[in-house]
């Protein structure tokens, strides 16, 4: 039953996210993203997939002269779905990590970002990540993300995993955890949204992370096309324009 449900959702997403970049042959590459983190990738009120990364992958497709179809897939299913050929690429704020490179191929980076810590607005003891370490607090993070891995390495911090970043924020507001660690550009964008009126960002941006398009390791020709397209989009200022359009600010930089 789960497989049937996935196929129905997957097919619906294909219809919603098709992008024909014009005159680039018949083959269409399926690109997966977890559209739950504004402004990187999220669903509009009209149920369109929008954000920095949907715009970017469409620009990459134009430069690479390929056709793509965007699908919305939960984070937990991204890597397995790619490896089992349910789709051909991932663009979803995926950080380049050595352990991930053993299983998948990564393009050159299109963005540099980091991690930020969020606490309730009435929190007085935690003003930085060091404070969180020293106070032995419970910190939430989305499972399978670099924020979650980052916390796992800190023995002085108790970690609680979530399938979605927004669920962690809800638990924070309700006093079930003390803080949330997440991707900096999405966190800074959301700070002015209604859900974030009860929380605040503390401390500096943690870590240096590079985001890349993810492919299967054997897709050498496609990887070459994607890398060349990203280089052109960096050189002609397109990625910088998208950075400005989606108000990523100092939370993320173009390489």
Predicted regions located by residue number:
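Short helix-initiation/N-cap motifs at beta->coil->alpha
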Residues: 54, 69-80, 127, 160-174, ...
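Flexible hinge/capping segments at coil-to-helix
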Residues: 120-137
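Periplasmic-binding protein-like
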Residues: 35, 112-119, 184, 188-231, ...
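C-terminal motif of bacterial Sec signal peptides marking the signal peptidase cleavage site
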Residues: 14-17
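A ligand-binding cleft/hinge motif common to bilobed small-molecule-binding domains
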Residues: 80, 92-102, 150-153, 173, ...
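Ligand-binding clefts/hinges and TM-proximal coupling segments of bilobed small-molecule sensing domains
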Residues: 20-21, 146-162, 201-202, 230-255
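Beta->alpha turn/N-cap motifs
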Residues: 32-37, 71-76, 85-97, 142-145, ...
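Extracytoplasmic small-molecule ligand-binding "clamshell" domains
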Residues: 24-93, 102
